[in-house]
Amino acid sequence: MITTSLRRRTAAAVLSLSAVLATTAATAPGAAPAPSAAPAKAAPACPQFDDRTKAAADRGVDVDRITPEPVWRTTCGTLYRSDSRGPQVVFEEGFHAKDVQNGQYDVEKYVLVNQPSPYVSTSYDHDLYKTWYKSGYNYYVDAPGGIDVNKTIGDTHKWADQVEVAFPGGIQRKYIIGVCPVDRQTKTEIMSDCESNPHYQPWH
């Protein structure tokens, strides 16, 4: 558990390096912090958007067709996706759903049977890549919204332990933080080869 947590923190540090440098560069050197008479305010809650497809790579997706009534994710934590495509493709194209027109819009049917759908799957679980290690890459995603699958259809289905967040219409490239390749022999991320996405745009 300690090793897993350490690797997760290391990957996050690698992928966040550019953001840290940008923040440092924006701070005037030698500037003293202004005194504050009032206590510091708490950090703002995760931004919420009326547009349920704000993250979508394909805006043609029709959320009104989604059944059952979806429970939308309202948190801002990092999500993860195992994928066989390398960053040279994903960083340029983002993640596109297989079929936003005629695919399976019913969330439960989509989850239980692998079939063309308007969704792109991600997970709350960083370590899920160890199950799908043959895919080769573990992508880090920072996108608004998405459907919390277990809260939508319950957590007793056979794939509940994947703690999935499904994105209707996929995920635009600007919401992908970066990627770590996976060693298929050891089922671990190759930390020295993690890459940050140059198109990533922090939004909160």
From Swiss-Prot:
Intervals of motif PN (phosphate-nicotinamide) loop: 132-136
Full protein name: Guanine-specific ADP-ribosyl transferase
Binding site for GDP: V111, L112, V113, N114, W132, Y133, K134, W159, Q162
Regulation: Inhibited by NADH.
Similarity remark: Belongs to the pierisin ADP-ribosyltransferase family.
Function recorded in the entry: ADP-ribosylates the N2 amino group of guanosine, deoxyguanosine, GMP, dGMP, cGMP, GTP and dGTP; oligo-guanosine, oligo-deoxyguanosine and tRNA are ADP-ribosylated less efficiently, while dsDNA is a very poor substrate. Also acts on GDP.
pH-linked activity: Optimum pH is 6-7.
NCBIfam families xrefs: ADPrt_Strmyces
Disulfide bonds listed in the record: C46-C76, C180-C194
Effect of E164D: No ADP-ribosylation of guanosine
